């Protein structure tokens, strides 16, 4: 038997079937770095319209987790897609380098600043620690295939950035938005520092929930205010609190003037409660009912004096709108030191704070009974004292959502302290910020409502911290008047120049005399540092506006949805305070990573996915494909199983690319590419499908619907290409003459498609795209990352054998395949090429099918196809209206070369084992194809 293998155009390519991404990618990264790929891209886009995505800085502490990977991959995909669209889209990665966690980690090694190590040396240790963390994270981000200015990222601890952060503060002062206030702020007793709203997270905490009686000091005064009071026993106003430790600082009880209140009889005593809460209080006390003995409006008891439950003093009743009937008793324990609402209502009545608790959460020496006690450990002592005094009505344990420090994970307290604030009301800053929200494009669009509602309850922003490792608040305050120095703007600039040279130590080590001269004795140098959210929040000023290759405002900010209360807000507030405009045109948010069951990821549960492990096992491109395949507008499920499925999808994409490349053997686009009008009908259709898909893909990239790109790509590879077109052209590719028009037509189509395909996947599967690019035929200049979208030829509108025609043919092919498969399963035929197919067609179906003439058999991949008039009894019914299919085993010999069963096999004596078509393709001029 003759071996005809050498006469076939068998596929060949250097593009490997097995990806081996984990092994291959590091070498490609090295090559990218050696060839200065990022710089090549910048050079290629020089002078083009810019697209600026500003990187929200991750915190420089610990290894990157899957959430970091998602964020960086999304940014990289968008930037690469924008570059393909012709934009100059630089990417400057950044890191947030100051703050408490770094201090804590350094303290563990060298002790507290000012105790075992001086402040200058401590700050240097913090700087060294942060730099080491940055290097570790940077290595992983680069390994993900993220391109950017990794040699010159921005760090909030860079001297220049620190200096510009100080300048940003100076602008805010200059524009009249800064003030010093004595207000209750979230306070970490572990970190001994104030926290901004953005640094607070809510976790469940078990607290004592107690009902406490504040006895009415003058019963006659009470009766005169509310009218007659029936019943017997002492009258007490009852408060409910989950923070017993704040009772030593109690200075009042607040009620709502508009609410209805009652006096109820409870055993030997009478209690004052909001009428709407009587039932829930009775349930709490374990009684069936509490009989009402008087009713009145809250306004009636404004100013009424009550006895403090354990101190020999009286406190007044105040009126406050913050009092509701959501829970408790409708009477609210009021300690202006320890609650925002308490502070506001007390301020209205001229009641000042007591400052009973120090920065470490310890009661000061002047606090009766509790001096020296820690607020975390005093609840039981307070409850015992209340019991002793007969003032404890009820106690229970309550699990509730409670503010915690997002860094140390410890419960916070509210504590009134002197702090620096960016005022949200002064100069209408909040109003301007809310107005700016309307001019920003939020994706998804619910982001607008989310940030808007958060801004509604936005207090003045406390930007001061009592830390060692942070950008200093470089202000001088008059010792007597507490006013800022009149020349603050110039002084801030002077200090900024010094910080630019020597870092923030230039301020901490500064002798005020150097700047203030003789005035130095009258002024105090502020020793507080800035909230880290201020550092990152002003990067629109210190980075975007400061770097020559960037431009303000940025086109896009892209972070997790938690940043509506974090970086998006701090950036917007500072930008409005400095420039009077938003720092971004568009804000895109992604959801959180969760496990396959939708549960939050946690090391303790053991359901985390390590990006490092994924890259080492499956490769970065699989991780990148998972990110693109997932709808990131909601929570993003990830697990080993999900990633395994993604790896399968990746293989389909890779195999499709491999088919394209392996069938372009011997094809030189410079000499062999056919004009579109000379290509076969099926090939023109395939290119047109690619062009239509490209239009969809580009739209999806522009609207950030990456999961749609994945779905469309997958469908293109599996259905339109793998399930139809590529199957059909194999015969033509392998069996026709190497340089025949029929083969060059298919190769021209494959070339067009792979040129487009490699660009479609480049932003997502970057390593694979580069690998494809290097295996493509023809001379290449630059890389796939410096290229622009490929211009695909389109079919003429209304072409006879256009898209609708080939879609119909695809349905017919599916119907025929089903019938053949049924016969094969029954053992009646071996495969499609061993089958002779008869199509019983209605007139309209027959008309369409006969357009392809004898080439219909190549499309249906059968040895012979006969189209006959419709029959209601012959053949099997199909899903195609007007079509029945009959399949019979071919009686003809199988061609040893093309495997078709043809009647002319053996008729040529020189080639007794092959068909006439193959003889023509070997020895003659070659067969001619018109359609497929």
From Swiss-Prot:
Does Phosphoprotein show up as a keyword for this record? Answer: no
Work out whether the entry's keyword set contains GTP-binding: no
Q: How does it assemble?
A: Monomer.
| Recorded family membership | Belongs to the class-I aminoacyl-tRNA synthetase family. IleS type 1 subfamily.
MF terms (GO), sorted A to Z: aminoacyl-tRNA deacylase activity; ATP binding; isoleucine-tRNA ligase activity; tRNA binding; zinc ion binding
**Could you name the Gene Ontology cellular component terms for this entry?**
cytosol
Positions of Zn(2+) binding:
895, 898, 915, 918
Q: Where in the cell is it found?
A: Cytoplasm
Anything noted about its domains? IleRS has two distinct active sites: one for aminoacylation and one for editing. The misactivated valine is translocated from the active site to the editing site, which sterically excludes the correctly activated isoleucine. The single editing site contains two valyl binding pockets, one specific for each substrate (Val-AMP or Val-tRNA(Ile)).
What is the UniProt remark on how the cofactor binds and its stoichiometry?
Binds 1 zinc ion per subunit.
The chemistry this enzyme catalyses reads: tRNA(Ile) + L-isoleucine + ATP = L-isoleucyl-tRNA(Ile) + AMP + diphosphate
Q: Please name every pair of cysteines joined by a disulfide bond in this record.
A: none
Q: What is this protein called?
A: Isoleucine--tRNA ligase
Matches recorded under InterPro entries: aa-tRNA-synth_I_CS, aa-tRNA-synth_Ia, Anticodon_Ile_BEm, Ile-tRNA-ligase, Ile-tRNA-ligase_type1, Ile-tRNA_ligase, M/V/L/I-tRNA-synth_anticd-bd, Rossmann-like_a/b/a_fold
Question: What this chain does, per the record?
Answer: Catalyzes the attachment of isoleucine to tRNA(Ile). As IleRS can inadvertently accommodate and process structurally similar amino acids such as valine, to avoid such errors it has two additional distinct tRNA(Ile)-dependent editing activities. One activity is designated as 'pretransfer' editing and involves the hydrolysis of activated Val-AMP. The other activity is designated 'posttransfer' editing and involves deacylation of mischarged Val-tRNA(Ile).
**Broad class of enzyme this protein falls into:** ligase
Q: What are the BP-aspect GO terms?
A: isoleucyl-tRNA aminoacylation
List of residues binding L-isoleucyl-5'-AMP: 559
Which Pfam families does the entry link to?
A: Anticodon_1 (PF08264), tRNA-synt_1 (PF00133), zf-FPG_IleRS (PF06827)
- List the CDD domains hit by this protein, alphabetically: Anticodon_Ia_Ile_BEm, IleRS_core
Give the source species.
Saccharophagus degradans (strain 2-40 / ATCC 43961 / DSM 17024)
* Enzyme Commission number: 6.1.1.5
């Amino acid at each position: 038997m003759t071996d005809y293998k050498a006469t076939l155009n068998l596929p060949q390519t250097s593009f490997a079937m097995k990806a081996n991404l984990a092994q291959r990618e590091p070498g490609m990264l090295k090559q990218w770095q050696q060839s200065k790929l990022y710089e090549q891209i910048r050079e290629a886009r020089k002078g083009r319209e810019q697209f600026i995505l500003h990187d929200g800085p991750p915190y420089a502490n610990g290894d990157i987790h899957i959430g970091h990977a998602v964020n960086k991959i999304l940014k990289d995909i968008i930037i690469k897609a924008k570059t393909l669209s012709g934009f100059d889209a630089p990417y400057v990665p950044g890191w947030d380098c100051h703050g408490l966690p770094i201090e804590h980690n350094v303290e563990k090694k060298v002790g507290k600043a000012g105790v075992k190590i001086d402040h200058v040396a401590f700050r240097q240790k913090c700087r060294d620690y942060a730099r080491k963390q940055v290097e570790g994270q940077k290595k992983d981000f680069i390994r993900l295939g993220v391109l950017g200015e990794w040699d010159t990222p921005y760090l909030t601890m860079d001297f220049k950035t620190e200096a510009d952060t100080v300048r940003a503060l100076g602008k805010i002062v200059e524009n009249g938005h800064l003030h010093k206030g004595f207000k209750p702020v979230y306070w970490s007793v572990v970190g001994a520092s104030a926290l901004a709203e953005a640094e607070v997270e809510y976790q469940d905490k078990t607290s004592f929930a107690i009902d406490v009686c504040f006895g009415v000091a003058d019963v006659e005064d009470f009766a005169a205010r509310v009218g007659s009071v029936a019943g017997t026993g002492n009258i007490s106003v009852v408060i409910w609190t989950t923070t017993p430790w704040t009772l030593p600082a109690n200075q009042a009880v607040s009620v709502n003037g508009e609410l209805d209140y009652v006096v109820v009889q409870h055993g030997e005593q009478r209690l004052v409660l909001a009428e709407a809460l009587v039932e829930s209080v009775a349930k709490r006390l374990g009684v069936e009912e509490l009989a009402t003995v008087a009713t009145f409006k809250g306004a009636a008891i404004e100013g009424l004096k009550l006895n403090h439950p354990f101190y020999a003093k009286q406190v007044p009743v105040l009126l406050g709108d913050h009092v509701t009937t959501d829970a408790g008793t409708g009477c609210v324990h009021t300690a202006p030191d320890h609650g925002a609402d308490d502070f506001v209502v007390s301020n209205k009545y001229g009641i000042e704070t007591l400052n009973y608790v120090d920065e470490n959460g310890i009661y000061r020496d002047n606090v009766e009974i509790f001096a020296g006690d820690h607020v975390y450990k005093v609840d039981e002592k307070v409850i015992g004292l209340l019991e002793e005094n007969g003032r404890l009505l009820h106690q229970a344990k309550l699990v509730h959502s409670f503010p915690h420090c997002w860094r140390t994970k410890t419960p916070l307290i509210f504590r009134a302290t002197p702090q620096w604030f960016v005022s949200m009301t002064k100069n209408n800053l909040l109003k301007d910020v809310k107005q700016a929200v309307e001019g920003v494009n939020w994706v998804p669009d619910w982001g607008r409502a989310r940030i808007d509602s958060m801004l509604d309850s936005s207090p003045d922003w406390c930007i001061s911290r009592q830390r060692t490792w942070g950008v200093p608040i470089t202000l001088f305050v008059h010792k007597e008047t507490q006013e800022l120095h009149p020349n603050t703007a110039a002084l801030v600039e002077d200090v900024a120049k010094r910080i630019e040279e020597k870092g923030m130590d230039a301020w901490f080590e500064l002798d005020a005399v150097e700047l203030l001269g003789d005035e130095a004795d009258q002024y105090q140098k502020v020793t507080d540092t800035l909230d880290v959210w201020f550092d990152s929040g002003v990067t629109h000023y210190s980075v975007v506006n400061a770097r020559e290759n960037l431009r303000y405002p940025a086109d896009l900010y892209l972070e997790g949805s938690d940043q509506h209360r974090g970086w998006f807000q701090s950036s917007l507030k500072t930008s409005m305070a400095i420039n009077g405009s938003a720092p971004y045109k568009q804000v895109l948010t992604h959801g959180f990573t969760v496990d396959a069951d939708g549960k939050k990821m946690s090391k303790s549960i053991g359901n985390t996915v390590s990006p490092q492990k994924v890259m080492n096992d499956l490769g970065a491109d699989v991780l990148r494909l998972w990110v693109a395949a997932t709808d990131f507008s909601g929570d993003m499920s990830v697990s080993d199983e999900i990633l395994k499925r993604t790896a399968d999808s990746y293989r389909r994409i890779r195999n499709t690319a491999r088919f394209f490349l392996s069938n372009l053997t011997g094809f030189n686009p410079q000499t062999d590419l056919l004009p579109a009008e000379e290509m076969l009908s099926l090939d023109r259709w395939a290119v047109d499908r690619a062009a239509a898909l490209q239009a969809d893909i580009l739209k999806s990239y522009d609207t950030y619907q990456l999961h749609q790109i994945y779905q469309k790509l997958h469908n293109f590879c599996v259905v339109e290409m793998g399930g139809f077109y590529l199957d059909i052209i194999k015969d033509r590719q392998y069996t026709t003459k190497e340089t025949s028009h029929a083969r060059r037509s298919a190769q021209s189509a494959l070339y067009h498609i792979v040129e487009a395909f490699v660009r479609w996947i480049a932003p997502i599967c970057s390593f694979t795209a580069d690998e494809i690019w290097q295996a493509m035929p023809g001379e290449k200049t630059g890389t796939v990352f410096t290229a622009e979208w490929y211009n695909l030829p389109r079919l003429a509108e209304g072409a006879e054998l256009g898209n609708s025609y080939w879609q119909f043919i695809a349905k017919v092919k599916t119907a025929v395949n089903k019938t053949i498969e049924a016969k094969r399963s029954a053992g009646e035929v071996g495969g499609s090429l061993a089958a002779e197919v008869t199509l019983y067609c209605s007139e309209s179906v027959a008309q369409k099918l006969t357009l392809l003439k004898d080439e219909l058999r190549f499309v249906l991949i059968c040895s012979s196809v006969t189209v006959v008039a419709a029959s209601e009894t012959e053949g099997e019914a199909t899903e195609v209206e007007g079509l029945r299919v009959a399949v019979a085993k071919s009686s003809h010999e199988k061609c040893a070369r093309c495997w078709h069963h043809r009647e002319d096999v053996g008729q040529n004596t020189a080639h007794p084992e092959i068909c006439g078509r193959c003889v023509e393709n070997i020895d003659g001029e070659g067969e001619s194809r018109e359609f497929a």
